[in-house]
């Protein structure tokens, strides 16, 4: 199974969705919903830098995919009144790739590097003096004739985004003056996002319909917008085009997205632990064989949300289903779950 095959995958699904995301993206901080802490901090730092006519300090945005890191980078550039250049860590293979971007920046411009944890060590070394002293040290020539040339750069702001902050090297992380973690959104925040997107897409939606979509969106705006588009199609064909709670519920049931935002693969994994392995503990290899998936798919794609929501636990002895998992599927809870015996292994 490929993650992007799932309707509730937090990653972008193709260029068409990227284009639609761009159209739905808020342009300024006042339009940005949620992330109150990060938004409040950025508003102060942006206003201060703008008042001094300086470049904003370098910004690191980290958190799960689909929460608005790229959107915030665009907003930072817009609020600062400067241009933004966008790239990603895997694309910057050589020092020259980064040098070409840096030397074409105007004063106070924003350089956005997505997946910054995937920068090569060679490129990262070039980035250090650029971030710290606004200078670029590059080697010209090879062998004994090689020489270092220093280029002065205009002041700029590097905005780095990553889903894996732990993979950043300490020297790189320490060079960011502003570090913001993006959290999963509440259902109310997502309902506001769904309402805003529905307005831009010219979709008639009721408050309860927006909430129904929000509750199943796994705390992620990207998923909420994707589900909205699918529910819109259902409402257009099966009803009068208005997205009510009943229409949203019927559409999402048809799409196999349940009340918790679980899809077929989530339920398959949980039921395997519950029914085939008596709730666990079960080793990862056995679980992978039982549901016909790769170990990496379970660890990187399926498990994180189930663990974060409290339906699955990782222990030294293996995976264990929690009381919530039994309750979700209407199964009797074994006595051992409530005794704490499993947690003490």
Curated annotation (Swiss-Prot):
Domain of life: Bacteria
Record flagged with keyword DNA damage: yes
EC number: 3.6.4.-
Subcellular location field: Cytoplasm
Amino acids binding Mg(2+): 70
Keyword Transport: no
GO molecular function terms noted in the UniProt entry: ATP binding; ATP hydrolysis activity; four-way junction DNA binding; four-way junction helicase activity
Single GO cellular component term: Holliday junction resolvase complex
Pfam families per record: AAA_lid_4, RuvB_C, RuvB_N
Signal peptide as annotated in the record: none
Keywords carried by this UniProt record: ATP-binding, Cytoplasm, DNA damage, DNA recombination, DNA repair, DNA-binding, Hydrolase, Nucleotide-binding
Region Head domain (RuvB-H), residue ranges: 259-345
Positions with a binding annotation for DNA: 295, 314, 319
Positions of the UniProt region annotated as Large ATPase domain (RuvB-L): 4-185
Annotated PANTHER family: HOLLIDAY JUNCTION BRANCH MIGRATION COMPLEX SUBUNIT RUVB (PTHR42848:SF1), PTHR42848
Family per record: Belongs to the RuvB family.
Quaternary assembly: Homohexamer. Forms an RuvA(8)-RuvB(12)-Holliday junction (HJ) complex. HJ DNA is sandwiched between 2 RuvA tetramers; dsDNA enters through RuvA and exits via RuvB. An RuvB hexamer assembles on each DNA strand where it exits the tetramer. Each RuvB hexamer is contacted by two RuvA subunits (via domain III) on 2 adjacent RuvB subunits; this complex drives branch migration. In the full resolvosome a probable DNA-RuvA(4)-RuvB(12)-RuvC(2) complex forms which resolves the HJ.
Domain notes: Has 3 domains, the large (RuvB-L) and small ATPase (RuvB-S) domains and the C-terminal head (RuvB-H) domain. The head domain binds DNA, while the ATPase domains jointly bind ATP, ADP or are empty depending on the state of the subunit in the translocation cycle. During a single DNA translocation step the structure of each domain remains the same, but their relative positions change.
Functional note: The RuvA-RuvB-RuvC complex processes Holliday junction (HJ) DNA during genetic recombination and DNA repair, while the RuvA-RuvB complex plays an important role in the rescue of blocked DNA replication forks via replication fork reversal (RFR). RuvA specifically binds to HJ cruciform DNA, conferring on it an open structure. The RuvB hexamer acts as an ATP-dependent pump, pulling dsDNA into and through the RuvAB complex. RuvB forms 2 homohexamers on either side of HJ DNA bound by 1 or 2 RuvA tetramers; 4 subunits per hexamer contact DNA at a time.
Name by which UniProt lists this protein: Holliday junction branch migration complex subunit RuvB
Gene transcribed to yield this protein: ruvB
């Amino acid at each position: 199974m490929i993650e992007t095959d799932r309707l509730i995958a937090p990653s972008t699904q193709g260029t068409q969705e990227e284009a639609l995301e761009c159209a739905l993206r808020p342009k300024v901080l006042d339009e940005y919903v949620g992330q109150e802490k990060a938004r409040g901090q950025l508003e102060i730092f942006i206003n201060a830098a703008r008042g001094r006519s300086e470049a904003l300090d370098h910004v690191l945005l980290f958190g799960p995919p689909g929460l608005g890191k790229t959107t915030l980078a665009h907003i930072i550039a817009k609020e600062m009144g400067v241009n933004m250049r966008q790239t990603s860590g895997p694309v910057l293979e050589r020092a020259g790739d980064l040098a070409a971007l840096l030397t074409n920046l105007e004063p106070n411009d924003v350089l956005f590097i997505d997946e910054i944890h995937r920068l090569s060590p060679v490129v990262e070394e070039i980035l250090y003096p650029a971030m710290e002293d606004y200078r670029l040290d590059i080697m010209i020539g090879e062998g004994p004739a090689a020489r270092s040339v220093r280029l002065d750069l205009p002041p700029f702001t590097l905005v780095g985004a990553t889903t894996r902050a732990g993979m950043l090297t300490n020297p790189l992380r320490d060079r960011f003056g502003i570090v913001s973690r993006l959290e999963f959104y509440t259902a109310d925040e997502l309902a506001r996002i769904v309402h805003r997107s529905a307005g831009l897409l010219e979709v008639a939606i009721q408050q309860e319909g927006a909430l129904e979509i929000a509750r199943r969106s796994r705390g992620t705006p990207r998923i909420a917008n994707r589900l909205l588009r699918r529910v819109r199609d259902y409402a257009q064909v099966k009803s009068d085009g208005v997205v009510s709670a009943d229409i949203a519920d019927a559409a999402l049931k048809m799409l196999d997205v349940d009340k918790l935002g679980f899809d077929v693969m989530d339920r398959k994994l949980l039921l395997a632990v519950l029914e085939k392995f008596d709730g666990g503990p079960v080793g990862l290899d056995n679980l992978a064989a039982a549901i016909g998936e790769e170990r990496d798919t379970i660890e990187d794609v399926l498990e994180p949300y189930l663990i974060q929501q409290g339906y699955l636990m990782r222990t030294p002895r293996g995976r264990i289903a929690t009381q919530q998992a039994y309750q979700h599927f209407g199964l009797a809870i074994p006595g051992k779950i409530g005794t704490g015996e499993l947690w003490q292994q």
